[in-house]
Amino acid sequence: MAVGKNKGLSKGGKKGVKKKIVDPFTRKDWYDVKAPTMYTVRNIGKTFVNRTQGTKIASEGLKGRVFEVSQADLTNGEDAYRKFRLIAEEVQGRNVLTNFHGMDLTTDKLRSMVKKWQTLIEATVDVRTTDGYLLRMFCIGFTKKCANQLKKTCYAQHNQVRLIRKKMTEMMVVEVSSSNLKDVVNKLIPGSIGKDIEKSCQHIYPLHDVLIRKVKVLKKPKFELGKLLELHGEGTSKGGAASTAAVAKGEEGVKVDRPEGYEPPVLETV
């Protein structure tokens, strides 16, 4: 038997004792995620982040988070195949204020539209809104049978496809370049751009299922808190954006009564 000190006994504890497990959620705070005024449902969920510790500020950890929400949840409607991406841009108290960051169709919707015996037509365009957002828009559409057609297929000729694609591009540029971001989102929710394209292309070849398939935000203007608050319906007429909903619930200043001639005590160290 080896002679020497038993390290396990000298420490006064058993070898391999488990450390106390601390629940990581005790260090986190929950925040409400708010959607802009374009949507019917404003409170879209909750998110959490580690509390402020030292130089790590909680609100900075929230900015830039992207939330993907179904249109049905945002509008209390039935169009669940359209998904909107919202990005966190500002934190006011316990509220995370978001802005539009993109739109997409669900995979099952896209797959269900692609069928045999018809021509698929796609168009892409980069266009800038009046308030400085550069958007890349993708449009998709399908040919359909003419009235009283007996033939099984409904294929468009190459020159017809080119004309339809040109019309799609022109319509998207006209609709977006004359609108700000809020108006563009209001057009995307009911799918009005796709319906207008479908009507304008009827004389070239009958179309159906014409939709804006995807929208990407390529560039944004310089961030302005006042504009974001206007988008959330919190802008103020008096004193401008600075006095904003200056303060979210529970964070307003409290008036303290002081006797006349009161002077604060001088601190020895700062």
From Swiss-Prot:
InterPro entries the record matches: Ribosomal_eS1, Ribosomal_eS1_euk
Positions with biased composition (Basic and acidic residues): 249-261
Gene Ontology CC annotation, any one: cytosolic small ribosomal subunit
Ranges of Low complexity composition bias in the record: 239-248
Gene Ontology terms for molecular function: structural constituent of ribosome
A single BP term in Gene Ontology: translation
SMART domains reported for this sequence: Ribosomal_S3Ae
Protein origin, superkingdom: Eukaryota
Family: Belongs to the eukaryotic ribosomal protein eS1 family.
Protein name as it appears in the record: Small ribosomal subunit protein eS1
